[in-house]
């Protein structure tokens, strides 16, 4: 029975739609369908060409302008960075040259002070050496005179002890001859 009910309900639906089938495939309505297709396509074309496409083109142009400006700004910043690097390198080289110049000046000043101190020390040493040589010469001269006096006294005492006559001039001449030669 369910089969007959289903067939009866299905038959009623077919009768309501008619026996022609799908209306899109009905050749009698193709002219009307083509007309409305063309009208719809023209309306879509007009909407796209007048409203949507200009907006899209404006957005694309704006993006292209932004990209171009960003690229130009990047090139400008790159040039500034290269310029800053060159200025930094030049300043660094100048600072190194200045430091070397200051170090050379300081070395020269220190060397001059050292040379001056050495010259002063050499002069003091030479003066003290001259004084020492003078003192040594005086001591030698005094010692030589003392040796001559002691030698003359000893020779006189020996001559007297040996029983000879003490001749002071002869003893002094003999001592002078021995000490000088």
Swiss-Prot record:
Q: What GO terms are given for molecular function?
A: proton-transporting ATP synthase activity, rotational mechanism; proton-transporting ATPase activity, rotational mechanism
Q: What is its main location?
A: membrane
Q: List the disulfide bonds.
A: none
Q: Which InterPro entries match?
A: ATP_synth_b/b'su_bac/chlpt (IPR002146), ATP_synthase_B_chain (IPR050059)
Q: Which residues cross the membrane?
A: 34-54
Regarding the membrane, this protein is recorded as:
Single-pass membrane protein
Pfam families named in the record: ATP-synt_B
Q: Where in the cell is it found?
A: Cell inner membrane
Q: What UniProt keywords are attached to this protein's entry? A: ATP synthesis, Cell inner membrane, Cell membrane, CF(0), Hydrogen ion transport, Ion transport, Membrane, Transmembrane, Transmembrane helix, Transport
Q: Per the record, where are the segments of Low complexity compositional bias?
A: 1-18
List the residue ranges of the region (Disordered).
Answer: 1-20
Superkingdom of the source species: Bacteria
Which cellular component appears as one GO term in the record? proton-transporting ATP synthase complex
Q: How does it assemble?
A: F-type ATPases have 2 components, F(1) - the catalytic core - and F(0) - the membrane proton channel. F(1) has five subunits: alpha(3), beta(3), gamma(1), delta(1), epsilon(1). F(0) has three main subunits: a(1), b(2) and c(10-14). The alpha and beta chains form an alternating ring which encloses part of the gamma chain. F(1) is attached to F(0) by a central stalk formed by the gamma and epsilon chains, while a peripheral stalk is formed by the delta and b chains.
Q: What does this protein do?
A: F(1)F(0) ATP synthase produces ATP from ADP in the presence of a proton or sodium gradient. F-type ATPases consist of two structural domains, F(1) containing the extramembraneous catalytic core and F(0) containing the membrane proton channel, linked together by a central stalk and a peripheral stalk. During catalysis, ATP synthesis in the catalytic domain of F(1) is coupled via a rotary mechanism of the central stalk subunits to proton translocation.
Q: Which family does it belong to?
A: Belongs to the ATPase B chain family.
This protein's name:
ATP synthase subunit b 2
Give the organism, scientific name.
Ruegeria sp. (strain TM1040) (Silicibacter sp.)
Gene from which the chain derives: atpF2
């Amino acid at each position: 029975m369910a089969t007959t009910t289903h067939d009866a309900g299905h038959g009623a639906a077919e009768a309501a739609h008619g026996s022609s089938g799908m209306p899109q495939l009905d050749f009698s309505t193709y002219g009307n369908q083509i007309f409305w297709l063309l009208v719809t396509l023209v309306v879509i074309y007009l909407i796209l060409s007048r409203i949507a496409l200009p907006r899209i083109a404006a957005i694309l142009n704006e993006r292209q302008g932004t990209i171009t400006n960003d690229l130009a700004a990047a090139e400008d910043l790159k040039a500034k960075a290269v310029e800053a690097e060159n200025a930094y390198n030049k300043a660094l080289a100048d600072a190194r040259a200045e430091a070397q110049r200051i170090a050379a000046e300081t070395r020269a000043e220190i060397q001059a002070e050292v040379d001056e101190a050495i010259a002063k020390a050499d002069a003091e040493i030479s003066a003290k050496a001259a004084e020492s040589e003078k003192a040594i010469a005086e001591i030698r001269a005094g010692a030589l005179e003392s040796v001559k006096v002691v030698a003359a006294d000893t020779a006189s005492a020996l001559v007297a002890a040996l029983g000879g006559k003490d001749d002071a001039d002869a003893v002094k001449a003999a001592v002078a001859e021995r000490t000088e030669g």
